[in-house]
């Protein structure tokens, strides 16, 4: 085991896959000598050169299109968005090309690529740089989405994503890059379509992902002190959802709370609600409650920024309300 920060775990995973497979390359802005805006690609340019680590101009639509074309020929590009919000400039390429080409070509082409980068609220980056694009990408046919939350799952997921035949949107949170954890030195993979049972419990199922995993864990300490027994699941796979793990939990607890940083309208929480109501309605003893960010542009002011995002105290209040519902 060795202690790694989350960004170091991602770096190590990418390094191993470039070493393992000559078809893997990285493309994006400032990923070369600079090492990426959050140092995820640090040291890769020096080792692999400019044919494997491609520094680009500020032109998201162009370098994303280049990467998709490369994927169509059998290469495995890793596209880094300096910020997830910037990838809106490449939405046409990601949606109409990467997501749909396998279908629209009658199976003649695949687009094995990873689109990754930082996003989320918490560093006073303003509205444009605090985007959470889960709601944008989840409606695009052909795309898979995962969100890492620990150094362990970050490394295992990025390796699995690079090896996948599908286009993967890989969400990283700006506030999680410096999370520390001991991870195995021996190679391992984390499945792309599997949720993680973070804590076993019997009274309520709390579904969450990314940064909100830590807000939920903080809230769980208070709930446990009050005598409650919450079950916590990090869904990890945002598309497709791991309904098997979710179903097993809800058939035990019969109560569910969804906690996300994505905005309420059209977010992952809305999709989860729909999926649960369609397949698990008979197992619910209470209405589903979902806690999401407010439908407002993220303020620059730090105090106001915090007000837009769900806090641990709100999770405690909501969980108690559901557990005591009659």
Curated annotation (Swiss-Prot):
The family database entries (Pfam families) matched by this protein are listed as: Transket_pyr (PF02779), Transketolase_C (PF02780)
| Binding positions (thiamine diphosphate) | 60
Q: Which residues of the sequence carry a binding annotation for K(+)?
A: 113, 161-162, 166
Under Gene3D superfamilies, the record lists: 3.40.50.920, 3.40.50.970
Subcellular localization, per the record?
Answer: Plastid, Chloroplast
Tell me one GO molecular function of this protein. pyruvate dehydrogenase (acetyl-transferring) activity
Catalytic activities: N(6)-[(R)-lipoyl]-L-lysyl-[protein] + pyruvate + H(+) = N(6)-[(R)-S(8)-acetyldihydrolipoyl]-L-lysyl-[protein] + CO2
Q: Which UniProt keywords apply?
A: Chloroplast, Metal-binding, Oxidoreductase, Plastid, Potassium, Pyruvate, Thiamine pyrophosphate
Supply the SUPFAM superfamilies for this chain: Thiamin diphosphate-binding fold (THDP-binding), TK C-terminal domain-like
Annotated InterPro entries: THDP-binding, Transketo_C/PFOR_II, Transketolase-like_Pyr-bd, Transketolase_C
State its cofactor. thiamine diphosphate
According to its UniProt record, where is this protein mainly located?
A: plastid
An example of a Gene Ontology cellular component annotation for this protein is:
chloroplast
| SMART domains (UniProt xref) | Transket_pyr
Could you say which EC number(s) this protein's record lists? Answer: 1.2.4.1
What does the protein in this record do? The pyruvate dehydrogenase complex catalyzes the overall conversion of pyruvate to acetyl-CoA and CO(2). It contains multiple copies of three enzymatic components: pyruvate dehydrogenase (E1), dihydrolipoamide acetyltransferase (E2) and lipoamide dehydrogenase (E3).
What is its quaternary makeup? Answer: Heterodimer of an alpha and a beta chain.
The protein depicted here goes by the name Pyruvate dehydrogenase E1 component subunit beta
> Which species is listed as the source?
Chara vulgaris
Lineage per the UniProt record:
Eukaryota, Viridiplantae, Streptophyta, Charophyceae, Charales
């Amino acid at each position: 085991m060795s202690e790694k920060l989350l960004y170091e775990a991602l770096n190590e995973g990418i390094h191993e896959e470039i070493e393992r497979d000559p078809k893997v390359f990285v493309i994006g802005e400032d990923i070369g000598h600079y090492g990426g805006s959050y140092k995820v690609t640090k040291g890769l340019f020096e080792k692999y050169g400019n044919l494997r680590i491609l520094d680009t101009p500020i032109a998201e639509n162009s370098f994303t299109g280049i990467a998709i074309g490369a994927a169509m020929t059998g290469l495995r590009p890793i596209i880094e968005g300096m910020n997830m919000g910037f990838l809106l400039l490449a939405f046409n390429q990601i949606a109409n090309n990467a997501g749909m080409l396998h279908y629209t070509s009658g199976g003649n082409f695949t687009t094995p690529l990873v689109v990754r980068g930082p996003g989320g609220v918490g560093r006073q980056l303003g509205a444009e740089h605090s985007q959470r694009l889960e709601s944008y990408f989840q409606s695009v046919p052909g795309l898979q989405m995962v969100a890492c939350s620990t150094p362990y799952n970050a490394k295992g997921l990025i390796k699995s994503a690079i090896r996948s035949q599908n286009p993967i949107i890989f969400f990283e949170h700006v506030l999680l890059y410096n999370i520390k954890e001991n991870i195995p030195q021996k190679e391992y993979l984390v499945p792309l379509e599997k949720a993680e049972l973070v804590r076993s419990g019997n009274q309520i199922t709390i579904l969450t992902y990314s940064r909100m995993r830590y807000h939920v864990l903080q809230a769980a300490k208070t709930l446990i002190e009050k005598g409650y027994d919450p079950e916590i699941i990090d869904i990890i796979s945002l598309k497709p959802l791991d309904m098997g793990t979710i179903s097993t939990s809800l058939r035990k607890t019969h109560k569910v709370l969804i906690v996300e940083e994505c905005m309420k309208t059209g977010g992952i929480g809305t999709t989860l609600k729909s999926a649960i109501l369609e397949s698990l309605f008979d197992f619910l003893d209470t209405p589903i409650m979902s806690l999401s960010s407010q439908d407002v542009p993220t303020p620059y002011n730090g105090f106001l920024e915090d007000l837009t995002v769900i806090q641990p105290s709100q999770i405690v209040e909501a969980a108690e309300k559901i557990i005591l519902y009659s």
